[in-house]
């Protein structure tokens, strides 16, 4: 071996150059470095220009929820094992190659089980809704090819274990040969770890299958269906296929016996390993001693590290360690070492449960009871595994809160250090080692937190023990910490990737430095023993492998080489432990992405989603912790990688995942968004109505909820959707404010202020509703008004100038209005013929009202008082300057009041004024109908360019000899346009028509009592003015006790009714002769002067007499308004 090395060192002498160096290589290197630097600068500028072109700033911080890509830094081996294991020692090459190949196959089988078999078996039975008859059988039918693959996979595991045992039996035996001599003092612990991994896989499969009760139940139903079809093939149209059905049934029974009954691992360890005449296993004492030695050593290392703070991924191997021990007992039937079993039992009590795959848990006590029942007698007859688990659960519950708090502080410190780019000084070597330590610390933290989370959930589920609400919050806090760690690794992935090569180099240097201690012991020697020669070859191979990338294949071979090196006994136990530690670190650094993802996985939350509403309720009561919601949602979607592998349903991604996502979104909406929207709305209302002196809440008793914390959250990423709480609350408030504002239009200002407050307090930009202030396109229908015109005129007031009717009073806080647009829309609905019908109804109404009008004036008491006033005015006309005296008006009002007052406090004069107002409202409605008709006609004909030159479409169609139907349609069009044109240009003089129809009768000699009407007009006008002043005063004071009649600010129906009646009676000249408005003007001026003179005489200041003067001015102003309305109304009835 040594000679071969010297030969290798001198075999390339012909390629050796002389030592002369002219500096040209340095110049070339600097030139290339300059070009590379310029390329990097140019590339950065191009990227910056692309970013500016996209008009979008790229996020400087990586986010695991939104980043479309991530850095994948796992190395892959390009060389075969044969090329890696290449030395001049042929026996060494052969043995190392065989066992490294076995270890590599074990690793591949383990990865295959984790990626292909675990998830489909775990999620089988998860349904997307209500299942119907036959769905279970269909699901099993889809699973059948998968189960056949699983059977082949299990058989491959069996054969691999047989191969390992056969290899062991060949090298560990009493008969001496070159192999036994080589492995005399070598303990291949790396191979035993591979066996542990295989046993873990088989035990995990047993646990997953047996704990999924839906799988066994569905398989039984499918088997019964096959038997039924086989017994009645004609019924199911499968006659002639009996052989296939028999084969299918046999296959189902075979798969059930092999896979579904929990004997996968047991069948493995009970298979035959002896090959008579070739390999002896059970009688091989050397193999038994070697096996026993390795089992004890491995268990010793496992027992000391399990539950330790530096533990990492040991619990996942616990089933494999137990499987290795059970395999040893089954293989060699050795149950004599009771002390060792007690050590195993102590570990079992310390770790009574292990999470092996998401929601599947493994219990070592059950494993021992099933496969080693005779060993339980060693620990006594009082064995009660359920009580052990309850005690363990009590301890976990007791320590849970404190451990979560401790982990929270540790994670916070670790995240700060990982995010920090500063170092504590020292060399680059020290900094890199520090980064390695930080990475491993993060993985260890996530591992322990994940174990705590799964242990709490698993024990409570298995023992059906209730969880405290506070513990539920702590459970989700564990998930938040796991996602925080994973997110930190993701954010720092660029830094980690940049340092991985240096980290690997440093770790390999440390390993080589340790191995140099062994190498130095053999330096300078010319003769070596066989064992020493094997150690030197192993050292050389280790050095060669560590010079390359740290792939799984290289690390496997290095571990086998280290097992060979350890036999030299040169390294101390501490050095060996450090070597193992650095090899483990090297493995972690090389595959950090997969390890972090596995240790931070929160898929178990899918099977604990019933706890999610409790967590959301706690979060809503503590808004300061709202930022943790995104981490929890990230944890909840970890199960996607599991559900996506479901085989029993078609398109699992669109069915299982969508059902789960919708369920979670519904919980968030129910427990966060809906109550948040209502509480924000309530808070805004309390702020806006603070002037009402609402009783304030005591913050020390009720607490203060900072709802803004939820609204400050960035949009939450959940699966492929985004939950924007701020946007949803804005939409809720927009919708609520709009709907409520629509019902109560008078509250528009309140809701406008609430929108402003929502912006200033919560940053919510709400939409303006753009509701009309008080006018809608649709009001009371003209047909309904026509049928109930007697009610309409009494409940609505008319405004002459705006040509609008306003409701007197309403049960709500809004008043309905009717304008030209409403009437126009009604006419468009019913047709223009409704206008004439409306006039007919108005005529009948006027006939009834004029009958009452005539009766009032025919009354002897009224008639005598009017005659008296007319006589007095005629006799004293000159003394009164032709102006009707106001004293007579006051006297007439007093006399009529003496005739009686109604229950509502109205006199006969008030009733008479109301009668005239109703008549005027009817006339105003007729005017409104006419205006609405013209509005309708103008809108209908507005697309005709010239009404004076309208072509005849009938002539045009006839000229071109179009079809009769077209000619008929053009005739109809001509008729419609002609009618609309006439209606628009001519219109109908309804007022003139109604004057003519009543004038003759009113001026008849039989109605002589009506000729004195004009003399009561001043009294009616004064009564109207008093009524308007009183109503406006009460409206201004916002009195809540006023009656419906007083709630008005306009009532021009009285003016138009008065003008109409004066025209009917032809008494306009008679009324003008009274010069009543001049009298009122003179009276007001005289009263003001008199009051000022009296005030001056008495020395009263002007401001003390202000109210009296103001009253006179209001009276004068109201009379002027009435005068203008009355004068405008008289214009309608001029000839």
From Swiss-Prot:
Keyword field: Acetylation
Keyword Acetylation attached: yes
Pfam family, one: WASH-7_C
One of the GO BP terms on file: endosome organization
Taxonomic superkingdom: Eukaryota
Residues found modified as N-acetylalanine: 2
GO terms under cellular component: endosome; phagolysosome membrane; WASH complex
Protein family: Belongs to the SWIP family.
Quaternary structure and partners: Probable component of the WASH complex.
Stated name of the protein: WASH complex subunit 4
Gene (UniProt): washc4
């Amino acid at each position: 071996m040594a000679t071969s090395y010297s030969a290798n060192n001198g075999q390339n002498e012909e390629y050796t150059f002389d030592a002369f160096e002219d500096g040209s290589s340095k110049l070339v290197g600097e030139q290339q470095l300059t070009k590379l630097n310029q390329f990097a600068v140019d590339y950065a500028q191009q990227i910056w220009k692309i970013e500016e072109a996209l008009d979008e700033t790229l996020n400087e911080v990586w986010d695991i929820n939104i980043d479309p890509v991530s850095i994948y830094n796992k190395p892959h081996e390009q060389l075969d094992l044969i090329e890696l294991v290449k030395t001049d020692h042929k026996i060494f090459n052969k043995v190392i190659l065989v066992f490294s190949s076995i270890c590599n196959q074990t690793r591949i089988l383990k990865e295959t089980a984790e990626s292909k078999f675990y998830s489909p078996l775990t999620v089988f039975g998860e349904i997307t809704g209500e299942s119907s008859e036959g769905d279970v059988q269909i699901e099993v039918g889809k699973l059948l090819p998968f189960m056949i693959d699983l059977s082949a996979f299990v058989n491959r595991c069996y054969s691999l274990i047989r191969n390992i045992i056969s290899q062991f039996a060949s090298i560990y035996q009493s008969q001496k040969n070159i192999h036994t001599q080589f492995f005399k003092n070598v303990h291949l612990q790396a191979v035993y770890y591979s066996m542990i991994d295989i046993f873990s896989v088989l035990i995990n499969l047993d646990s997953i299958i047996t704990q999924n009760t839906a799988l066994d139940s569905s398989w039984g139903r499918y088997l019964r269906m096959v038997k039924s079809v086989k017994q009645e093939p004609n019924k199911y149209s499968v006659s002639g296929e009996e052989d296939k059905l028999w084969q299918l049934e046999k296959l189902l029974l075979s798969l059930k016996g092999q896979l579904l009954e929990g004997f996968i691992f047991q069948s493995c360890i009970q298979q035959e390993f002896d090959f008579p005449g070739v390999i002896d296993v059970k009688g091989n004492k050397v193999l038994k001693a070697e096996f026993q030695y390795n089992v004890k050593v491995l268990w010793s290392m496992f027992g000391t590290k399990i539950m330790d703070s530096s533990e990492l991924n040991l619990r996942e191997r616990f089933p494999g360690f137990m499987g290795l021990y059970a395999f040893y007992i089954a293989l060699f039937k050795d149950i004599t070492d009771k002390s060792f079993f007690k050590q195993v039992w102590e570990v079992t009590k310390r770790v009574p449960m292990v999470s092996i795959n998401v929601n599947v848990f493994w219990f070592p006590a059950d494993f021992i009871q099933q496969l080693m029942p005779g060993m339980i007698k060693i620990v006594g007859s009082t064995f009660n595994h359920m009580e052990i688990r309850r005690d363990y659960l009590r301890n976990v519950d007791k320590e849970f809160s404190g451990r979560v708090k401790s982990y929270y502080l540790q994670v916070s410190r670790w995240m700060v250090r990982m995010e920090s780019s500063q170092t504590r000084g020292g060399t680059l070597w020290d900094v890199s080692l520090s980064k390695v330590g930080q990475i491993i610390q993060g993985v260890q933290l996530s591992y322990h937190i994940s174990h705590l989370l799964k242990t709490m959930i698993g024990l409570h589920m298995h023992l059906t023990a209730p969880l405290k609400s506070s513990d539920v919050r702590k459970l989700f806090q564990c998930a938040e910490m796991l996602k925080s760690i994973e997110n930190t690794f993701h954010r720092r992935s660029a830094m980690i990737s940049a340092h991985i090569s240096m980290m690997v180099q440093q770790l390999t240097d440390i390993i080589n430095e340790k191995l140099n201690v062994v190498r130095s012991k053999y330096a300078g020697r010319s003769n070596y023993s066989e064992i020493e020669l094997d150690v030197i070859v192993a050292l050389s191979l280790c050095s060669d492998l560590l010079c390359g990338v740290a792939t799984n294949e290289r690390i496997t071979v290095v571990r086998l080489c280290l097992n060979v090196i350890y036999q030299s006994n040169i390294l101390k136990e501490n050095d060996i432990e450090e070597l193992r530690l650095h090899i483990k670190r090297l493995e972690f650094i090389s595959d950090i992405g997969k390890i972090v993802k596995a240790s931070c996985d929160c898929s178990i939350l899918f099977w604990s989603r019933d706890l999610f509403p409790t967590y959301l309720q706690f979060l809503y009561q503590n808004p300061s912790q709202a930022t943790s919601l995104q981490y929890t949602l990230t944890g909840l979607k970890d199960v996607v990688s599991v559900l996506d592998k479901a085989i029993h349903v078609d398109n699992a991604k669109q069915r299982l995942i969508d059902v789960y996502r919708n369920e979670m979104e519904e919980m968030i909406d129910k427990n966060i968004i809906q109550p948040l929207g209502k509480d924000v709305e309530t808070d805004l209302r309390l702020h806006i109505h603070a002037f009402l002196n609402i009783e304030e809440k005591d913050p020390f008793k009720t607490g203060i909820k900072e709802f803004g914390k939820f609204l400050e959250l960035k949009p939450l990423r959940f699966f492929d959707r985004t939950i924007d709480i701020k946007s949803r609350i804005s939409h809720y408030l927009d919708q609520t404010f709009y709907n409520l504002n629509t019902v109560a239009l008078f509250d528009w200002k309140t809701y406008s202020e609430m929108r402003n407050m929502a912006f200033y307090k919560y940053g919510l930009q709400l939409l303006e509703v753009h509701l009309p202030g008080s006018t809608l396109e649709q009001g009371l229908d003209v047909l309904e008004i026509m049928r109930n015109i007697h009610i309409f005129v009494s409940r609505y007031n008319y405004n002459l100038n705006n040509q609008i009717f306003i409701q007197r009073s309403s049960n709500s806080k809004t008043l309905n209005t009717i304008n030209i647009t409403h009437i126009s829309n009604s006419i468009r609905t019913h047709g223009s013929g409704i206008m004439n019908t409306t006039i007919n109804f108005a005529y009948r109404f006027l006939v009834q009202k004029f009958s009452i009008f005539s009766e009032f004036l025919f009354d002897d008491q009224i008639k005598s008082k009017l005659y008296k006033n007319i006589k007095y005015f005629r006799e004293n006309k000159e003394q009164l300057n032709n102006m009707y005296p106001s004293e007579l008006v006051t006297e007439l009002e007093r006399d009529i009041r003496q005739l009686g007052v109604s229950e509502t406090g109205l006199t006969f004069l008030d009733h008479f004024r109301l009668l005239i107002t109703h008549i005027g409202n009817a006339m105003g409605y007729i005017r409104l109908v006419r205006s609405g008709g013209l509005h309708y006609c103008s809108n209908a004909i507005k697309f005709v360019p010239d009404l004076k030159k309208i072509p005849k479409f009938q002539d045009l169609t006839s000229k071109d000899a179009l079809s009769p139907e077209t000619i008929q349609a053009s005739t109809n069009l001509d008729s419609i346009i002609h009618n609309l044109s006439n209606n628009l240009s001519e219109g109908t003089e309804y007022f003139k028509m109604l004057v003519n129809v009543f004038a003759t009768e009113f001026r008849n000699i039989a109605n002589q009592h009506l000729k004195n009407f004009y003399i009561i007009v001043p009294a009616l006008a004064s009564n109207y003015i008093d009524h308007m002043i009183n109503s406006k005063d009460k409206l201004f004071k916002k009195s809540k006790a006023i009656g419906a009649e007083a709630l008005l600010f306009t009532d021009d129906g009285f003016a138009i009714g008065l003008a109409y009646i004066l025209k009917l009676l032809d008494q306009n000249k008679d009324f003008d002769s009274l010069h009543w408005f001049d009298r009122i003007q003179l009276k007001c001026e005289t009263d003001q002067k008199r009051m000022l003179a009296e005030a001056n005489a008495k020395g009263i200041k002007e401001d003390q007499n202000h109210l009296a003067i103001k009253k006179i001015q209001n009276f004068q102003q109201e009379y002027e308004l009435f005068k203008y309305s009355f004068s405008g109304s008289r214009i309608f009835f001029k000839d």
